[in-house]
């Protein structure tokens, strides 16, 4: 699947260099995520080819630190 991987807080992995981004690509390809490619889109790391089990934004009942 494709999407924004999330932190335990429910927030997207943030990034600042839009487009091709080494940090996002590395985050997406981490073994537990299984992604094939990652880049920075709307200041969040967007991943392609994630494992179905990888949590992606938005998470149900998690609003990125807001209550």
Swiss-Prot record:
Gene3D superfamilies: Knottin, scorpion toxin-like. Residues 65-67 form a propeptide. Expressed by the venom gland. GO terms for molecular function: sodium channel inhibitor activity; toxin activity. It holds the Pfam family Toxin_3. It comes from the Eukaryota. PROSITE patterns: LCN_CSAB (PS51863). One of its GO terms (biological process) is defense response. Residues 1-65 form the LCN-type CS-alpha/beta domain. Disulfide bonds join 11-64, 15-40, 24-45, 28-47. GO terms for cellular component: extracellular region. InterPro entries: LCN-type_CS_alpha_beta_dom (IPR044062), Scorpion_toxin-like (IPR003614), Scorpion_toxin-like_sf (IPR036574), Scorpion_toxinL (IPR018218), Scorpion_toxinL/defensin (IPR002061). The modification Cysteine amide is found at residue 64. Belongs to the long (4 C-C) scorpion toxin superfamily. Sodium channel inhibitor family. Beta subfamily. Beta toxins bind voltage-independently at site-4 of sodium channels (Nav) and shift the voltage of activation toward more negative potentials thereby affecting sodium channel activation and promoting spontaneous and repetitive firing. Has the structural arrangement of an alpha-helix connected to antiparallel beta-sheets by disulfide bonds (CS-alpha/beta). This is Neurotoxin Cex9. It comes from Centruroides exilicauda.
């Amino acid at each position: 699947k494709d999407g924004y991987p999330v932190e335990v807080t429910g927030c997207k992995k943030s990034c600042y260099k839009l487009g091709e981004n080494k940090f996002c690509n590395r985050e997406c390809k981490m073994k537990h995520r299984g992604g094939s490619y990652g880049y920075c889109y709307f200041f969040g790391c967007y991943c392609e080819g994630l494992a179905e089990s990888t949590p992606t934004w938005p998470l149900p009942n998690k609003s990125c630190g807001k209550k």
